[in-house]
């Protein structure tokens, strides 16, 4: 309880700085997810059947899909970083289900849904997220459950873990811009100063293994 109070106090100080970096963070997330998806599309891998895998690739880009979620979900800034952490946990625990163009959209909407429910005091229900994500409520319910089992119900995120991932995403974006290898357009994400930021850390994670080509932090 004391840790939660300390984190909530810290969130008040983090709110404005986090608002400033969120456009870059979200753009980096879009780029990294697309890069991982395209890389795994070209790999010959044995992949187990999954509710996340679609028959065809969605026509909407990862960038546009994340923009749509950001526009309509109205969840706290931290939810997107925590969703990224959850996705990284998912690919580590599910080595035979790498992120690719056939499952990345469903994984994104589900990770944000789970993150918002865990992080925020108030969040939209599954039916609303299903409409935002372009799927049915029944499918959203199934994806949520499968995702929770996929990450072993490991929802807690420590402050240090959150900060590490946030810094990683910022560094990735800065490096991409410096190398002029970022092919996405400048961010169009708009940040509201009224968004509440809440975190509930209970564990320590490590970024030491984030260089596997199937993982989100892969180079």
Swiss-Prot record:
The answer, when asked if Glycoprotein is one of the entry's keywords, is no
Highest taxon of source = Eukaryota
Which Gene3D superfamilies does the protein's record reference?
Cyclin-like (1.10.472.10)
InterPro entries assigned to the protein according to its UniProt record, in alphabetical order: Cyclin-like_sf, Cyclin_P/U, Cyclin_PHO80-like
GO biological process terms, alphabetically, are: cell division
GO MF terms here are:
protein kinase binding
Tissue expression profile of the protein: Expressed at low levels in roots, stems and flowers. Expressed in the shoot apex, leaf primordia and young leaves.
Alphabetized, the UniProt keywords read:
Cell cycle, Cell division, Cyclin
Would the keyword Nucleotide-binding be found if you checked this record's keyword annotation? Answer: no
Q: Which family does it belong to?
A: Belongs to the cyclin family. Cyclin U/P subfamily.
Assembly with partners or alone: Interacts with CDKA-1.
> What's the name of the protein?
Cyclin-U4-3
Organism, by scientific name, is Arabidopsis thaliana
């Amino acid at each position: 309880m004391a840790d939660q109070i300390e984190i909530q106090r810290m969130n008040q100080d983090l709110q404005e700085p986090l608002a400033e970096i969120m456009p870059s963070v979200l753009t980096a997330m879009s780029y990294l997810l697309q890069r991982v998806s395209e890389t795994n599309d070209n790999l010959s891998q044995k992949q187990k059947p999954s509710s996340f895998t679609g028959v065809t690739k969605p026509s909407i880009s990862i960038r546009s899909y994340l923009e749509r979620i950001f526009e309509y979900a109205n969840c706290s800034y931290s939810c997107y970083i925590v969703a990224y952490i959850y996705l990284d946990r998912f690919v580590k625990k599910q080595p035979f289900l790498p992120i690719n163009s056939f499952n990345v959209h469903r994984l994104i909407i589900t990770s944000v849904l789970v993150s918002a429910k865990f992080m925020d005091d108030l969040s939209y229900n599954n039916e609303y997220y299903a409409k935002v994500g372009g799927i049915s409520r029944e499918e959203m319910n199934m994806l949520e459950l499968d995702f929770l089992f996929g990450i072993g119900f490991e929802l807690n995120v420590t402050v240090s873990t959150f900060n590490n991932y946030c810094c990683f995403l910022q560094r990735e974006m800065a490096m991409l811009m410096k190398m002029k290898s970022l092919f996405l357009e400048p961010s169009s994400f708009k940040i509201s100063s009224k968004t509440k930021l809440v975190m509930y850390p209970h564990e320590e994670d490590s970024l030491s293994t984030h260089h596997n080509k199937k993982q989100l932090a892969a180079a």
